[in-house]
Regions:
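NTP/phosphate- and nucleic-acid-binding module
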Residues: 14-16, 21, 49-52, 58-110, ...
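Low-acidity, Ser/Thr- and Arg-rich intrinsically disordered low-complexity segments
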Residues: 2-5, 9-22, 27, 31-38, ...
Length: 661
């Protein structure tokens, strides 16, 4: 499955001195001389001022202006803001175009927010009770194209706060008024006009609607205003936008292939898992074939961890709320925790959102010596976390999940080796499971101090340890400021699903906080008691999320060792059913998962049904194979080989044992 690609070009950089008395010079004035022989392309600018904007923004002597020519797909100025990417600028401008079209077609509509997102954009609308569906999208898109062809400029203005509120109030745009009150600081408000349409926005934008040529509206969804379930539910319209029609066409083809691989679709088609409203959203049911795959994954994970010195334990799914008060989760993680179960005697029990407090208690069941360290406690433990219904997605984001979790208790001088060992284990799991493309993110804290436990020095030490571990292993990484856990920084292994959405699959975290909160000590070699360090790690992540990734990675055609049905034995006629059963029994004796198809159906039908289930091998038996004790083996490439039954048993047993892909 190929993704649409755009060949990168070197960004054009322009330095120009503008006389102070010409303060009204537009940023667009320099664009024609900057364009390398292609006329005047779409552009955006960045300026050191509160509101960025390309057309109506003036510049003063001593200020610098950056012009992004939009035939440069990915300029790199060493910054990471979304507006530094001209493709994001184009998509954000297309979101404004969408809102302008909606307001023309539905004057009563109230518009919320419309950002650029990965591969596209969206805008949230309140249609006043009117139902809007995907059947309405062609008309909206048609109006967008009419506005685009009208060559309407994006005009940036800075209004006094009072005037901005009045402008939106007279349009009855209550959500924009609310945003000004809640989000905009100071006495000036940055807005953009596109014809009669007015939006609250910092920019930047393309020069004109005429620069928006390759876009398409994709789907409609519901979304609570500002992500709050207590606020009105709005209609969210998603779209995509690209610089050229060819890139748009490539992207749409990519989506067609991604849809075929979507784990929610394949999970239903292959009968791997189900979701039922009677059970509840985000609470998937593992069906027999899905549960078989999960057992294989867990067996593989546990066996490898045991071979690396981990001790596997079992702990309960609930604990007293006081345990999570001591760990800090009740104070700093409560939005993801379920309400406690309260009893008449005053006891409060909590569904656990994490496993670490339980493993800490196991550590404290006896006095530990330096000889006991490092102590690696592991578990595939059930966790329960509240997620808003709008964020739930198949198996990828759920409310109940089983986490491949471990906590390593070690001395400070053992820390580096343990972090590197955890990274190595995650790499090994990725190699065997076929997670070929991933990236590292070093997730650190931000400056909001009440979100984090511990001192700045402790955080710096922990972050340095993780960075050093990655660098010593030759791994590159990016930083995710503000993405750390509340008790410490972490390394996140980021992977992408079939739709290129990024998510965290594995983590390694260094924690100096919980050892302090739980007074975790060990007896050192000199007989004194010392504080130990704790490493949290989830080398394979949650079983549900890993499962969703593997479904899409293999499009349901799992490697033989993972597939719930490794062989289908198909008889050509009823008279060979007894031999088919013998073949099935021999395979089962070698711990091969097999189904014997003795239905009174044509052989082509039996093969077709096995192919739909993406079974790795089909062993056909008939008048030629039965007397000789052979099987005719068909694999997923349609390669056919007749061989003795024992040779086939040896071949498939080796493939399963070696976990070949």
């Amino acid at each position: 499955m190929s993704e649409p690609t755009v060949a990168p070009r070197k960004p054009h950089r322009i330095t120009t001195k503008i006389d102070w008395w010409r303060a009204a010079v537009q940023a667009a004035a320099v664009s024609s001389s900057a364009s390398p022989g292609k006329g005047t392309p779409a552009l955006s600018t960045r300026m050191p001022m509160p509101a960025n904007g390309p057309l109506s923004t003036s510049t003063r002597e001593g200020q610098s202006t950056r012009v992004h020519i939009l035939d440069d797909p990915m300029p790199d100025y060493g910054e990471h803001e979304a507006t530094d990417d001209p493709l994001q600028v184009l998509r954000h401008s297309t979101a404004h175009l969408l809102a302008a079209a909606v307001v023309e077609l539905h004057p009563e509509a109230k518009y919320g927010i419309g950002p650029a997102v990965q591969d596209g954009f969206y805008y949230d609308f309140d249609f006043g009770g009117k139902s809007i569906s995907e059947a309405d999208l062609p008309a909206i898109e048609s109006r967008m194209r009419r506005l685009a062809q009208a060559d309407i400029p994006f005009v940036h203005e800075v209004l006094p706060r009072k005037q901005a509120i009045e402008e939106f109030a007279k349009r009855d745009q209550i959500y924009k008024v609310e945003l000004i009150h809640d989000k905009v600081e100071g006495d000036e408000v940055s807005v953009y006009r596109t014809g009669e349409f007015l939006d609250l926005c910092r920019g930047p934008h393309v020069r004109s609607t005429k620069d928006l040529k390759a876009f398409k509206l994709m789907r409609v969804a519901g979304a609570y205003w500002r992500g709050d379930e207590k606020k009105p539910q709005l209609t969210r319209i998603y779209g995509t936008a690209w610089q050229t029609q060819r890139e748009l066409d490539d992207y749409l083809k990519f989506l067609e292939e991604a849809e075929k691989r979507d784990h929610k679709k394949l999970g239903k088609d292959l009968k791997l898992f189900a979701v039922d409203d009677r059970v509840g959203p985000g609470l998937p049911l593992w069906l027999p074939d899905g549960a078989t795959i999960r057992r294989e994954l867990e067996r593989f994970i546990v066996d490898e961890e045991l071979s690396r010195g981990y001790l596997h334990v079992r702990t309960p799914d609930v604990a007293r709320l006081d345990l999570y008060r001591q760990s800090g989760h009740a104070q700093l993680y409560s939005e993801y925790m379920y309400p406690p179960m309260k009893f008449e005697d005053g006891e409060e029990l909590e569904l656990r959102p994490v496993n670490c407090p339980h493993h800490i208690v196991i550590y404290q069941t006896e006095l530990r010596s330096y000889r006991d360290l490092p102590l690696r406690i592991a578990e595939i433990g059930n966790n329960w976390r509240y997620e808003r219904s709008g964020t739930l997605a198949g198996m990828n984001r759920v409310r109940a999940f089983a986490l491949n979790d471990a906590h390593i208790f070690c001395t400070p001088d053992q820390l580096m080796d343990e972090v590197k060992g955890a990274i190595d284990l995650a790499l090994y799991f990725s190699k065997v499971l076929g997670i070929d493309e991933f990236s590292y993110q070093l997730s650190t804290r931000d400056d909001v101090k009440d979100k984090w436990l511990g001192t700045e020095e402790q955080w710096e030490d922990a972050q340095a340890a993780l960075a050093e571990a990655l660098e010593s292993m030759g791994q590159t990484y990016k930083r995710g400021v503000g993405d750390a856990a509340f008790y410490g920084p972490k390394i996140d292994f980021q992977v992408r699903d079939a739709h290129r959405r990024e998510f965290t699959n594995s983590t390694v975290q260094v924690d100096f906080q919980l050892p302090q909160r739980f007074d975790l000590e060990y007896v050192a070699e000199d007989g004194t008691r010392k504080r130990r360090v704790m490493v949290h790690r989830g080398a394979a992540g949650a079983m549900e999320r890993l499962f969703s990734y593997l479904i899409e990675r293999y499009a349901g055609a799992f490697p033989t060792w993972l597939h719930p049905t490794q062989v289908v034995v198909a008889s050509t006629k009823d008279e060979f059913n007894d031999y088919a059963q013998e073949v099935g029994a021999r395979l089962r004796a070698s711990r091969v998962r097999v189904q014997v198809d003795t239905r009174s159906e044509r052989l082509n039908r039996k093969i077709r049904d096995a192919r739909l289930k993406k079974v790795p091998f089909i062993a056909v038996v008939g008048e030629k194979e039965a007397p000789a004790g052979h099987v005719n083996v068909n694999d997923r490439t349609d390669k056919q080989v007749e061989m003795p039954l024992e040779a086939f048993v040896s071949m498939i047993s080796a493939e399963i044992a070696e976990r070949r892909r």
